[in-house]
Amino acid sequence: MANYISSVLKSLLLLLHLVFLIQQHVDSASIVKFLPGFEGSLPFELETGYIGIGEEEEVQLFYYFIKSERNPKEDPLLLWLSGGPGCSSISGLLFENGPLAMKLDVYNGTLPSLVPTTYSWTKTSSMIFLDQPVGTGFSYSRTQQYNKPSDSGEAKRIHEFLQKWLSKHQEFSSNPFYVAGDSYSGMVVPATVQEISKGNYQCCSPPINLQGYVLGNPITEHAIDYNYRIPFAHGMALISDELYESLKRVCKGEYVDPRDTECLKLVEEFSKCTKGVCQEVVIKPLCVTETPNCYIYRYLLTTYWVNDVNVRKALQINKESIGEWVRCYFGIPYTHDIKSSVPYHMNNSINGYRSLIYSGDHDLNVPFLATQAWVRSLNYSIIDNWRPWMIKDQIGGYTKTYANKMTFATVRGGGHTAEYKPYETYIMFHRWINGQPL
């Protein structure tokens, strides 16, 4: 009898220990009221934390959550995924659509400063900025035994993250929910939307109040994205008429891994012509190093800021997570198993979800021509034809709306991500998320 009682007690103690460990990791969320480098208390509500993913919750995904500054009880809830794969979501928070930005002072050895922005999407929406896949930003694995990330696998992990996050934040379970991102997240976001939609029908209660998704300059299919660089470069006067006509005649519109020797030579000539161009926004100087007069200097300042011991303490970073933080880590063993996200867009449209697809019109990486091409391939009827959308009396870009609830828009003068035209992108998003015509 004594042995039996002892065994039961040991089992109970083990169970309590496991519960404690799970609580340590899964429920590790903290309200952040002050951040080093920002003067005074934060003028918005910021929460940071980890959510455990997997059977043993070995993967710990880190997030920043900012409540809507308007009406968090009713405003939409957005999940933001940065590209890469392997780029921290702080890229969105500090450069693209968050309420804070780096103050662009020359680094002098002291902690870089933060300043408030006027273009934050959190003015009208609550936002979760998620570091994914594992190995990105502050997300990490407690063991080496976990499923290596992939496009389709990330869609499932993100869905699991959302289910667990919403179970801890049930006050947001009825808010309209959207998935958003840019660049490489163009491969993951549509698959994530489909995964959530499938979960709502098959398994999960309560369902996530999924309404749609937002994508900026999304990578969609390598061949489409690359093939349209040539006509885009010609339109931007980066290559000559003669080279463009030769490329069209010899390569017949297929410029990816050409087997024809003459086509290969012409593609190499194209590469030489565009080698000195900033791929993200062709009108910006190409910067090799992060010097103070360069646009990407803010990335260096962010690295200094995030790696400060007091900043990491304020953000409640688990000490076991990572060593030095990097904005984009491209050493993640990642499987690119979705070759085209176009079928996911088609399925999501059939299921009735709204979508805003926007393109900075000076991006050479994913030209607006490529995005236009796959949107056009969906073959949906047009309900609002090509027209300028305005900010006061100035053209912010051009837009077209389709019968499948998809809106396509360009951002005039914009680049690969929203950071190049954050105010204009905010105006566009604000109108769309509130159901207004652009």
Swiss-Prot record:
Main location class: secreted
The record's tissue-specificity note reads: Expressed in seedlings, roots, and siliques.
Any one GO CC term of the record: extracellular region
Pfam families the UniProt entry points to: Peptidase_S10
Q: Which UniProt keyword terms apply here?
A: Carboxypeptidase, Disulfide bond, Glycoprotein, Hydrolase, Protease, Secreted, Signal
Drop me one GO molecular function for this one: serine-type carboxypeptidase activity
Q: What is this protein called?
A: Serine carboxypeptidase-like 5
Q: Which organism is it from?
A: Arabidopsis thaliana (Mouse-ear cress)
Classification of source organism: Eukaryota, Viridiplantae, Streptophyta, Embryophyta, Tracheophyta
